[in-house]
Amino acid sequence: MGKRSYEEAEGSNADGQEQNQAQKRNRNPHNRFNPKNIAKRQKTTQKINDGNLSQIKKRVRAIERLLEHKNEKLPANVRNDLERELQAHKQRIVDESDRKLRSKMISKYHMVRFFERKKAMRLAKQLMKQLDETKDEAEIARLKADLHIAEVDLDYALYHPHMETYISLYPKPKDEAAEKDEKSSAAHHLHSSRPPMWTTIEKARQEGKSALEKIRDRRPERDFSKPTSKKTAKKSSSQSEERPAKGKFGKTEEESANESDDGGFFEED
């Protein structure tokens, strides 16, 4: 068997090195060019685009960790793109949580608002009928004031913010006999105190229906300026600073001293 030439040996060595590098590249789980990683990234991106909330939250945490890493020197354009993506994902999370909260609150207070709307509407019709029949000026002024309250009550039941706790205008009396009495209806609570939102609705009525709808559909304000991971880090660090030092058996020195003074763990009442 003859010896191989120098060129043949060099060529075979080069082919072997390339093959080894390709195998290492495919075996490395952190290599971005690994076909498995490429498929995984594409699958994750598809889930994010489809609105998968858990995947969106994971992506938010990953971006925040990347932006907060001091040793990671990112180009300005890459950092700007990541910050814009972070804000967009946070807004999607807020929109989804608000949608769930709105649906929950509407379902929770649906019956209360429905019955109070019916009571206010019935009371307003009664007052309008009395207003048409009376001719006394003092009585007319009183009925107009009561009619205004009933109309605001109706708008309160219609346009109270869906994402806020609904405070009843006509709470049920504790006494069952009073509940059956006619005076326990909306007319009985006509001059009772009203929640602060009632005054807001009363002022918005002067601006028109669009102002009332804006109040009904308003959402709680949120601040996106600070990343969530920093908040949790600060919270954990502050808790660790405030936590007293623990002594033997995992108890604080103060607890151990109190137990020794009181005569042990088992106390008699």
Curated annotation (Swiss-Prot):
Pfam family for this entry, one: Efg1
Biased composition (Acidic residues): 255-269
Domain of life per record: Eukaryota
Presence of keyword rRNA processing: yes
Gene Ontology CC terms, in alphabetical order: nucleolus
GO terms under biological process: maturation of SSU-rRNA from tricistronic rRNA transcript (SSU-rRNA, 5.8S rRNA, LSU-rRNA)
Keyword rRNA processing recorded: yes
Biased composition (Basic and acidic residues): 202-225, 240-254
InterPro entries found in the cross-reference section: Efg1, EFG1_rRNA-proc
Record region (Disordered): 1-53, 177-269
Biased segments, Polar residues type: 14-23
Location in the cell: Nucleus, Nucleolus
Coiled coil residues, start to end: 52-157
Keywords recorded for this protein, A-Z: Coiled coil, Nucleus, rRNA processing
Family: Belongs to the EFG1 family.
Function: Involved in rRNA processing.
Name of the featured protein: rRNA-processing protein efg1
Organism: Neurospora crassa (strain ATCC 24698 / 74-OR23-1A / CBS 708.71 / DSM 1257 / FGSC 987)
